[in-house]
């Protein structure tokens, strides 16, 4: 009997390890679709729900991903999948499902109509992208009177139009694994064909419309997948039906 109980428990744990998907309390979801794993561009679309059914609330918008395409990231879902996984400097955007963090900006206020947690970036802010350093993939604030020797290389972008507004995509964010990828955001693209190193980038008006739409109480998430993976996983992961996703 004890052996049977142990087997049942292990089976339940195995099922739970692969059943992660969109959290039940997530009411805002951004869906990103790439044509294939090696695609450096695709489309995003915003969805929301009051009950169980997702509804599209925006048309699909063209965006850029990492120059080399996608690889599985570490978030709510995707990290246990077989295949290529995101690594630092691989120029791939993390695929899977991810919670969204706060907005980072050079401004001291959000755009009119926005109501979401934000942080004003200053000269003292760093985001650690070197896997050899403590606090990898963490935002920290240093003492400018006594900066550490690594600070200049890890300092957050200053006065860069592409980073004037950005939203954290929480890849590898909880107990970060050194070398598994860092500093992943939605941010402004430098041009229609200027790919990022792993972020999802778009024209500023599209990004600002997303910032105005987001609400912390809706527990917003981002799902980024190649089209074939989306069709295979949408039901198990609680994603919008493929017929609703115009990018497919």
Q: Which functions belong to the PLM regions below?
A:
Residues 4-13:
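Sec-dependent N-terminal signal peptides
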Residues 18-196, 205-248:
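Cell wall/extracellular polymer interaction/catalysis modules
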Residues 199:
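Short cysteine clusters
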Residues 202:
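A conserved hydrophobic position in a structured secondary element of the catalytic/binding core
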């Amino acid at each position: 009997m004890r052996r049977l109980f142990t087997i049942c428990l292990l089976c339940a744990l195995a099922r739970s390890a692969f059943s992660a998907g969109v959290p039940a309390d997530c009411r805002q979801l951004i869906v990103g679709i790439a044509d294939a794993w090696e695609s450096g561009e695709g489309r995003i679309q915003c969805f929301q729900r009051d009950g169980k059914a997702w509804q599209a609330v925006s048309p699909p918008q063209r965006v850029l991903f990492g120059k080399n395409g996608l690889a599985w990231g570490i978030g709510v879902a995707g990290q246990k999948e077989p295949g290529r996984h995101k690594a630092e400097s691989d120029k791939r955007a993390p695929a899977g499902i991810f919670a969204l963090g706060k907005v980072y900006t050079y401004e001291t206020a959000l755009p009119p109509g926005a109501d979401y947690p934000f942080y004003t970036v200053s000269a003292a802010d760093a985001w650690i992208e070197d896997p050899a350093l403590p606090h990898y993939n963490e935002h920290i604030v240093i003492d400018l009177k006594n900066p550490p020797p690594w600070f200049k290389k890890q300092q957050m972008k200053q006065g860069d139009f592409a980073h004037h507004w950005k939203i954290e995509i929480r890849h590898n964010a909880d107990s970060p694994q050194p070398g598994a990828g860092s500093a992943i955001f939605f941010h402004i693209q430098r041009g229609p064909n200027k790919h990022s190193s792993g972020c999802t980038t778009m024209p500023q008006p599209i990004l600002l419309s997303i910032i105005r739409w987001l609400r912390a109480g809706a527990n917003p998430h981002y799902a980024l997948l190649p089209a074939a993976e989306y069709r295979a996983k949408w039901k198990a992961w609680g994603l919008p039906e493929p017929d609703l996703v115009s990018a497919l």
